[in-house]
Amino acid sequence: FPIIYSFFNKNNSLDLKLMKEQIQLIKKIGSNGIACLGLATEVQKLSFKEKKVIIELIANNCNYKIPTAITIQGNTFDEYVKLIEVARFNQASWIILQPLLKTKHISETVCYNFYKKLIPFTKDTIVGVQNAIEYIGVGLTPKKILKLYKSFPNFRAIKGEASSVFIEKEISRYPKNLHVFNGR
């Protein structure tokens, strides 16, 4: 799925007109889906309110006619839960969870336990994780990914940010219905 970028006005507020034009262009070219709030959208720099506005902008402009993938990143566990609720309310097709990035020195165990605690809030929405060890220094090994896959029937996606050589090796270890999207 193409991902929308965050654009800003001179006063540093979101340029919703330009972002809406971006969404319309993606729809016009016949994309099979659209994503938002990933690293390209500068999600870590946005406020909760701005993230909510972008989720609603996507939903309102896609009219639920093309799948939407919403990346969730917050400053606290509670903020993650609230953003998941916003994404679900706006009928996100997929929810992609980023690790809690308070520090780049998060162990794999802490990252895994965070996802394990958070995934139940996604309920029946397809959920995945942003697994970008090479890029952001935080992520899960294939062993932990498979553990999540076996534990949650809706855990069916990974958003990678790795080289094609690295991601090819990872994909070979996963079941066919665990979708892997990669891009940088």
Residue locations for each model-derived region?
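Active-site beta->alpha loop and helix N-cap motifs at the rims of alpha/beta catalytic domains
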Residues: 1-139
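Catalytic alpha/beta core domains of metabolic enzymes, predominantly
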Residues: 117-126, 132-184
